[in-house]
Design a protein with these regions (language model features):
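A short, exposed helix-loop element centered on a Lys and neighboring polar residues
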Residues: 1, 45
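Catalytic tyrosine of NAD(P)H-dependent dehydrogenase/reductases that use a Tyr as the general acid/base
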Residues: 33, 41
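Active-site helix of classical SDR
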Residues: 36
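Active-site loop immediately N-terminal to the catalytic Tyr-X3-Lys motif
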Residues: 25-31
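Alpha-helical segment proximal to the catalytic Tyr-Lys
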Residues: 5-6, 49-53
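SDR active-site lid
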Residues: 53-121
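A short helix-coil junction within the Rossmann-fold of NAD(P)-dependent oxidoreductases
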Residues: 2-11
Length: 146
């Protein structure tokens, strides 16, 4: 909101909104997180139309599997028990992409003019799974996550 008027006046700029691969797929036990990330994606897609012809672009970034402390910081409580422990173990297996690699992917995507940038371990797989098999991917996710 603060920078958009200036970008519109200059007829150039790029708004980069960070969503998540969970902005494409509804992941088990992540409902609140999914809502926020689908929302970021929806806002960005709305901006594609609203900014058309203005010289200003909007990009949604969908990282996943980035090796940060998000899984540890996002733990809810010990009372969540077995489900929490299972998700923590899954996170250890999937959070493999270094943050610097993710940042490089984002910069490259912005420079290419991409509207969506999908980066990180298994993120492209989940993205295409949700697009090509929208009625089947939830079952596949359940099988993969145990």
């Amino acid at each position: 909101k603060a920078f958009l008027p200036m970008m519109l006046e200059q007829r150039e700029g790029c708004i980069v909104n960070v969503s998540s691969v969970f902005g494409f797929v509804g992941f088990p036990a992540q409902g609140a997180y999914n809502i926020s990330k689908f929302g970021v994606r929806g806002l960005t897609e709305c901006l594609w139309s609203e900014l058309a012809g203005s010289g200003v672009r909007a990009v949604s970034v969908h990282p996943g599997g980035i090796k940060t402390n998000i899984e540890i910081a996002g733990r809810r409580c010990a009372a969540a028990g077995e489900e929490e422990s299972r998700l923590a173990k899954l996170g250890e297996k999937l959070l493999l992409t270094p943050p610097a690699e993710c940042a490089a992917d984002i910069l490259a995507g912005v420079e290419r003019g991409d509207l969506q940038i999908v980066t990180g371990n298994k993120s492209s797989t989940l993205h295409w799974l949700s697009r090509l098999l929208p009625d089947r991917y939830p079952k596949i996710l359940r099988l993969l996550t145990g």
